[in-house]
Amino acid sequence: MHDQTLTGGQALVRLLAGYGVETVFGIPGVHTLELYRGLPGSGIRHVLTRHEQGAGFMADGYARVSGKPGVCFVISGPGVTNVATPIGQAYADSIPLLVISSVNHSASLGKGCGSLHETQDQRAITAPITAFSALALSPEDLPELVARAFAVFDSQRPRPVHISVPLDVLAAKVARDWTGEVRRRPARGPAAAADIQQAADTLRKAKRPMIIAGGGALHAAEQLRALSTRLGAVFFSSVAGKGLLPDEAPLNAGATLCVEPGWQLISQADVVLAVGTEMADTDYWRERLPLNGELLRLDIDPRKFNDFYPCSVALHGDARATLDALLQALPPTPADAGAAIHAVADLRQAVQNGQGPLQQIHRSILQRIAAELPEQGFIASDMTQLAYSGNYLYPTRATRSWLHPTGYGTLGYGLPAGIGAKLGAPERPGLVLVGDGGFLYTLQELATAVEELRSPLVVLLWNNDALGQIRDDMLDLNIEPIGVLPRNPDFAALARAFGCSVSQPASLDELQQELREGFARNGVTLIELKHACAR
C-alpha cells in the first residue's frame, strides 16, 4: 500500500495553490523534482521557460499586469544565479516576486563538499536584492516562510522573496498536513490622522500645488484624479505610474520629469505631494529634481521619507486609504485650476517642440503604435532608445499598461515580461518594444511564447544594427566607439524558425498596417523595423 503522506515539495505546491497561485514559471531540474511531483492536480499551471532569467522576467511581467505575485521555481546554484538579475529588477521596481529554489542537502550546506550545483551560501546570494531570503530547515518551516512572503506582498513595499529548500526537506514526509494554513493579513491602513490633517492644511494654503505619483499608487488612481481636480494641481507620474490619470486630462503632465519642460514646471511648485514613488534619478534622468517648495511624502515604506528629498510631512500608510482620508480633510470645493491647466498645455507643446531628430523618429513610430494598439492593450518595453522616448511620449491609457525595467535597467526584459504579462492577462493584446541588442539577451523565449500563447502578442524589434545608446554616449564623451556595432543574425529567419509570423515593413505606413494585422492575429508576430525604414 502506498504511503499517502505528502512530501515537503508536494505540500508546498498545495500551499501555494491555497494562496491563489495559478501560474508558476520555471525549468524542471534534478534538484526540483519533488516540486514537480506536486504540480499535477494542484490547479497550478506550469510555464516552461528556456532560461531561468526568462522565468524571472515572465513572473515580473505577470505580476505587473495582474497585480498578483509572480512565482518561479528554479534549481540550486546556476538556477539561482541565473534568476538573480530578474530578482534585482523586481527589487528595484517594487514588484512582488516569489522565487522557490532547491538547495543542496542540509547536512552538506557550507561545507564545500563539491556537490552538484553547490554554492558557499545560496541564501546570501539573493539577500541584498530581496525583502528577505530564507532557508527552510524542515518541511514545517515552509508555511511560516510563505506566510511571511505574502505579508510582504500584502502589507509592505512589495519586493521579491527567495525561499531555498534543501533536497532532503523537499523529499521529506511532512509531520502534519499544513497545506491549508493560508494566512493573509493585509495590514495597510491610512496614515496617522494628525499627519493627514497637517498635510491637508499645507495643501489648502498652497498656491501652486503639484503631485508626483508612482507605482506605489497604482491602486489609487480614482483618488489621485479626485485630488488633482480638488487642488487644481498639476499631476506628474513616474514611469511606473503611467496611466494613473487619463492622458487627455488637462492637469496631467505625464511622465515628463525626465525632460527640461518638466523640470521647469515642477520647480514652480510651492507644495509637492509625492505618492508611492521613491523619486529616484532613474525616472528623472538627472541626480535631483529642482524642488523649491515644501515636500509632502506618502509611502508604505517609511525609509523613503528622508531619502534624496527629506519631507516636511511624512504620511506613512496605504496610498488609497490615506488619499481617501486626505480628500475628506480638504474643502469640498475644487480650487481654480485655470493657471495649472494652462501650464500643462504649455508643457505639452514644449515637449513636442523640443524633440531632436532621433526622438522625432521615435515619436512617429509611437504614434503609429498608439493608433493600432487596442484600448485594453499593454506594452512591455526593453532598455532601448525607442522605449526611453516612449516613457514620456507614449499616451498610456490605463495603469499596468506600460511595463518598463526602470530602476535596475536590465537589457533582455521586454520579451519575457511581455510573455508573462500575456499569461497574467490573456484577454489583453500585448506589444513588446525591444532593440536588437536587448533582443539577443532573451530571444530564446520566443519558443515559450509560441508554445503557450493563443492570443495576440506583437514583438516590435527596433533594429538599428547597433548598441545605439552606448554608441551615442561614447560619441558625446569623445570616446571612439568600440564594441557597439555588432554583426546581427537574420532575425526574421530566427523568428520563423521558432514559429512566429514575421514581417519587415519598409515604411511607417506599412508598419501601421502590420501592427493592425498583428493585433488581429492569434499567436506571436515579429515585426522587424529597420532604422532606415522609419525616416
Report the location of each language-model feature.
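Structural motif
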Residues: A213-G216, G276, D382-T384, L529-H531
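Active-site flanking residues adjacent to catalytic metal/cofactor-binding acidic residues
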Residues: V275, L298-I300, S381, G435-G437, ...
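N-terminal alpha/beta PP-like core and its mobile active-site loop of ThDP/TPP-dependent enzymes
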Residues: H2-T333, R368, E372-E375, R454-V459
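Phosphate/pyrophosphate-binding active-site segments
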Residues: M1-D3, E140, W178, L291-M383, ...
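Conserved structured core elements
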Residues: G29, A221, W263, G317-R320, ...
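Active-site diphosphate/adenylate-binding microenvironment
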Residues: L12, A17, I27-P40, V344-E427
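Short acidic-aromatic active-site loops that bind/stabilize oxyanions
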Residues: M1-T5, L135, R188-G189, G354-Q359, ...
